Amino acid sequence: DLLRLITLAGKEELARLRIEVDFDVERPETVAAYRELLSSIATKTNETTWDELSDIFEDAEREGEGIPAILERLSAYYGDRKSEWQLERIARTTTTGGANAGLLEAWRQSEVVEGGEWVSALDDRTRTSPESDFDHVHAHGETVRLGELYVRTGESLAYPGDPSGSPGNIINCRCTQAPIVIEDEE
């Protein structure tokens, strides 16, 4: 692991410099440097992965592709590093969140939609309590005005798949939302 590598490199460098001091990996400055390095590596790795995945999804969207074609693109990107179900989870999570974000933005721009209604898949794979901390069965049918958040899932979400939600609430979510149109007062 990285801490072991830092320790080994530190000890080797002290030996190379012929300094007879024990390398202290628990020294506050060393711990701080280790944490900063880990944070930087994680951030850069995530940024790089995000950029590459964004390109994959943008290309798929431009081509009008669905989840099966996206799975092929993800398989080519990840190779053997991810299983089929992991790739499907990535594709489903990203397309669900993206589609629902697009719906919400369209409603905001429409001037005829006043709110939304949460629509769950309602099958044996739909999240429900007590099996899950998040309840998409109970969320089914919840209505909110534009600008308000859905809360019945166990968290406040702007839409199904909202990335501000916890992983357990949005990963593999298959829910969508339906518009509530302003009634004509004729």
Predicted ranges, named:
Residues D1-L8, E12, R16, E20, ...:
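Activation/maturation switch segments at domain boundaries
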Residues D1-Q86, T94, G98, G165, ...:
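N-terminal leader/targeting and assembly helices and adjacent pre-domain segments
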